[in-house]
């Protein structure tokens, strides 16, 4: 996304149908392209302040609106997966906006562009009834769905490097449901 020389907001916008009460997560992959920050915003049926600024130079979440939940993860080579999650407050048409920002604290997003700077954007995705971003699902404009990501080790394809008797396994994950408490048999 390259900014124009006009004074204004330099952005991409996509509309979508929203059901009240559901949590939606908007995510995209960003990389610096002359500007240092990006904004993801969910508006209209989400009320106000459902946005976050992402610092693409330092790989951190900058300013966050009062009602959004923001996350950033480095995927290497200067690319970051950024996301904002928010609950819809009404049914109707919502809008996902992706903005260029000059820094991670200026939420106005309106400025005079230079005509050549910007940010790289790839893999923008919106997920309904999701409290965080799942893995990327390629689509061609139509709604797509798939099952949960499932990591399973079966068969003998891994026997050359995996020894059941020794070693360590490290797994990073995010709970999609609150943890259960109490005793279960």
Regions found by a protein language model. Name each.
Residues 1-185:
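Extracellular and organelle-lumenal recognition/adhesion modules and their flexible linkers in secreted
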């Amino acid at each position: 996304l390259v900014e124009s020389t006009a004074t204004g907001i330099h952005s991409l916008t996509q509309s979508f149908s929203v059901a009240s009460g559901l949590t939606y997560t908007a995510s995209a992959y960003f990389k610096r392209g002359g500007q240092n920050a990006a904004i993801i915003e969910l508006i209209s049926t989400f009320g106000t302040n459902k946005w976050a600024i992402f610092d693409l130079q330092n790989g951190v979440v900058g300013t966050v609106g009062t009602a959004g939940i923001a996350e950033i993860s480095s995927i290497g080579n200067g690319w970051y997966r950024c996301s904002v999650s928010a609950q819809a407050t009404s049914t109707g048409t919502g809008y996902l906006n992706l903005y260029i920002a000059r820094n991670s604290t200026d939420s106005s997003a309106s400025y005079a562009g230079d005509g050549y700077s910007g940010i790289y954007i790839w893999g923008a995705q919106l997920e309904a009834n999701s409290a965080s971003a799942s893995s990327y699902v390629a689509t061609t404009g139509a709604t797509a769905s798939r099952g949960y990501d499932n990591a399973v080790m079966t068969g003998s394809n891994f026997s050359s490097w995996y020894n059941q008797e020794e070693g360590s396994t490290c797994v990073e994950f995010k709970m999609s449901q609150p943890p259960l408490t109490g005793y279960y048999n």
